[in-house]
């Protein structure tokens, strides 16, 4: 296709080009993508976005050596990706905050459990800390993100009774943050 042609033209000029395919569908069809489109350098799923910089570096090194077969990273890593993502600073009155990923419902029409994995919720303490950062940057309205946010069940703040918190608990904690409306 067009990307292959662009890559070949750039390589003819001595310019490196790395093509990555990412997302849920890429995760589900990763091996097939590499097989059908050998010019694709990287295929990764949503759970491994945080590894993209090292995959690009690896693909770039492989291009120089000439024996590159494509990097396929579609597994569910042991470590949560939220620990590896850069901290976001709000640049306006509203901001988005990921609190949950995945789904355990397995509805017949949905691929989320297969491509995003089991439900995983961030700890309340981590969500509140990020929300405070967003509020200090000017965010007054914070939209909580996830595939199934109403199933949120994060670890409570240390020292509080009980071990897990539902969405209502999280919202009450976020409402206590100065500046958040």
Q: What annotation goes with each model-predicted range?
A:
Residues 1-153, 174:
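Proteins enriched for Cys/Gly/acidic motifs involved in redox and nucleic-acid/cofactor modification
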Residues 117, 156-161:
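Short glycine-enriched, charge-decorated loop/helix-capping segments at active-site entrances
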Residues 161-181:
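Alpha-helix-loop-beta-strand connector modules within alpha/beta enzyme cores
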């Amino acid at each position: 296709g067009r990307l292959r042609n662009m890559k070949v033209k750039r390589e003819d000029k001595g310019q490196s080009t790395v093509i990555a395919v990412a997302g849920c569908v890429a995760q589900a069809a990763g091996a097939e993508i590499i097989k059908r489109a050998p010019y694709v350098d990287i295929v990764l799923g949503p759970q491994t976005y945080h590894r993209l910089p090292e995959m690009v570096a690896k693909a770039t090194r492989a291009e120089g050596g000439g024996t590159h077969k494509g990097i396929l990273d579609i597994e569910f890593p042991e470590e949560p990706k939220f620990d590896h993502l850069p901290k976001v600073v709000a640049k306006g009155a509203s901001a988005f905050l990921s609190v949950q990923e995945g789904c355990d419902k397995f509805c017949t029409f949905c691929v989320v459990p297969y491509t995003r994995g089991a439900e995983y919720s961030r700890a309340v303490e981590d969500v509140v800390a990020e929300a405070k950062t967003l509020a200090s940057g000017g965010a007054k309205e914070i939209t909580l993100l996830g595939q199934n946010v109403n199933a949120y069940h994060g670890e409570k703040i240390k020292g509080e009774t009980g071990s897990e918190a539902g969405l209502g608990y999280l919202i009450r904690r976020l409402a206590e943050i100065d500046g958040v409306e």
